[in-house]
Amino acid sequence: MLNQIVKLRTNLLQYTNKSFTKYELKLQTIQNSLYGVDLEYDAVEIAKLRLWLSLIVDQETNGLAPKPLPNLNFHLRVGNSLVDTFENIKLWSTRWRGTKKQAKVNNQMNLFNTDTVEAILKRLKDAKVQFFGTSDEKEKQKLSNQIEIEQMELIRSELVAQGKFDVYTRIEDMIKKKTKPFFIWELEFEEVFKNGQGFDIVIANPPYVQLQKEGGRLANELKDQGYETFTRTGDIYCIFYEKGIDLLKDCGILCYITSNKWMR
């Protein structure tokens, strides 16, 4: 996908007065257009390595020290891409933008308005941009912590507005133990979904596993996630199709490696 985007942009440059090296086009594309999620840590690390290698081969040093590689931790994520709730509770919604929410918690009225949310989102965006380009380890850790804190603050605001602060305390305890059983696309990649948008293209090779296998473990995990295609006797690839379509912007393109059984 990276090479295809760079090829298209290179062809378009001839109609403009702008000029970019292949390395610059790749770096811009990685920073602004490529995102990924996988349940397996090793798969994510391999994807990072492939992008780094693709950058290295086109970096012209001209006898100078090579430029530091970008930090991809917040572009390529480890997580369960099909689960975005906790205890069947929605943890974040882009509907926050442009609205005001009011919640009664412990007999106190808490008002979270768009100014508060937008300020957090702005800090989150700025921290991600800085994190992508920094090579200082201390600064990297500082920014990573800030991003996690800002995301948790948005989750807290959502749950408090729902009157479910007790749920937040349980999530906080899990995060401290390095456990996170959900992946919130609209929050992790908020810049993609702002203003009701989504991905232009979603590419995947979904697994083919019957939900009733392993004693119905997958069925139990997904039954309350709100998928219209869910049936206990179904296959997880159907859920992936629904999720992929849901992540697309209007007129977006879904590109999956799939069986031809449904065409027979």
What residue spans do the PLM features occupy?
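Conserved S-adenosyl-L-methionine
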Residues: 1-87, 258-264
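SAM-dependent methyltransferase catalytic-core segment centered on the flexible catalytic loop
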Residues: 1-20, 84-132, 146, 150-264
